[in-house]
């Protein structure tokens, strides 16, 4: 059984989250449900496949973390400008939600998907499941050979909830925040803390994970849509894509663009 989770605040729900959930319900199989971890918003959706959580009630550690650490510096402000790589506040909601779901889900496979995504075709479930072999505890979108963004793209993550080390991972991941260790890292963005926790579990337990982009990666511009995910889903990363309502054809690598342009969504 597969389960999905996402997170958003009130403005995010109105700008892109509602569309994400509506297109999820339209295209994903009927036996796949989605858990919404909501920050100060109620969606009003009445559908048995949609389970809504107040993130502050469901993830009790988040309040203390925010009360202790929510300041300009920890929001990534450097020299008067925000640098997302050092933002330990905005992205912490994703982390606490993922750790809660890992520990409380009864599914076999858990997918974290960013709320600024759109599903435009039926997901190939069997092919998706092949991205996460039984002996791997997580699968992710890597950015190998990217010196500017030397960490995973965490708009999509898969978790094998039947793996013996998956709860070791959630413990390490959440511990980075509850202990303040996140502030000792080179970067505080969740992409880097995910990589840190993943590598810790790999090194400590000999566990395996899968970079779905392969050893050479899938470019620096927009690896999400260049994976198999781009055949049924779009990730509206950044203000420009959100304003346009979709990603750009130029986001595709040349060898992938031709196939994508056969789909109505990308034309």
Predicted regions, residues:
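Residues that flank catalytic or metal-binding motifs in active/ligand-binding sites
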Residues: 94, 113, 152-155, 190
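Conserved catalytic core of nucleotide-sugar-dependent glycosyltransferases
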Residues: 120-187
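N-terminal anchoring/stem segment of glycosyltransferases
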Residues: 1-80, 103-107, 161, 236-241, ...
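A structural signal for well-ordered alpha-helical segments within the folded catalytic domains
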Residues: 15-18, 92-96, 188-196
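Extracytoplasmic beta-rich repeat domains
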Residues: 86-88
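Conserved hydrophobic/aromatic beta-strand scaffold that supports enzyme active sites
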Residues: 97, 156-158, 233
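Catalytic core and acceptor-binding pocket of nucleotide-sugar-dependent glycosyltransferases
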Residues: 161-266
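GT-A fold catalytic core of metal-dependent nucleotide-sugar glycosyltransferases
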Residues: 90-141
């Amino acid at each position: 059984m597969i389960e999905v989770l996402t997170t958003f605040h009130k403005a995010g729900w109105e700008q892109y989250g509602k569309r994400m959930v509506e297109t999820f319900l339209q295209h994903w199989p009927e036996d796949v449900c989605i858990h919404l971890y909501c920050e100060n918003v109620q969606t009003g959706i009445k559908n048995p496949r949609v389970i809504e959580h107040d993130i502050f009630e469901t993830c009790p550690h988040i309040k203390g973390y925010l009360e202790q650490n929510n300041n300009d510096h920890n929001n990534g402000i450097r020299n008067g400008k925000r640098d997302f790589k050092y933002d330990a506040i905005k992205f912490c909601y994703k982390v606490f939600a993922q750790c809660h779901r890992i520990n409380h889900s009864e599914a076999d496979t858990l997918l974290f998907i960013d709320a600024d995504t759109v599903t435009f075709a039926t997901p190939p479930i069997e092919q998706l499941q092949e991205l996460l072999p039984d002996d791997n505890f997580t699968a992710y979108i890597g950015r190998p050979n990217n010196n500017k963004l030397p960490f995973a793209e965490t708009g999509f993550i898969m978790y094998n909830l039947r793996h013996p080390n998956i709860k070791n991972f959630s413990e390490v991941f959440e511990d980075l925040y509850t202990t303040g260790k996140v502030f000792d890292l080179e970067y505080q963005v969740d992409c880097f803390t995910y990589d840190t926790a993943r590598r810790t579990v790999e090194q400590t337990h000999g566990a395996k994970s899968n970079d779905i982009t392969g050893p050479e990666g899938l470019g620096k511009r927009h690896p999400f849509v260049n994976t198999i995910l781009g055949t049924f889903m779009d990730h509206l990363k950044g203000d420009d894509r959100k304003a346009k309502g979709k990603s750009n054809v130029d986001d595709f690598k040349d060898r992938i663009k031709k196939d994508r342009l056969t789909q109505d969504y990308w034309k």
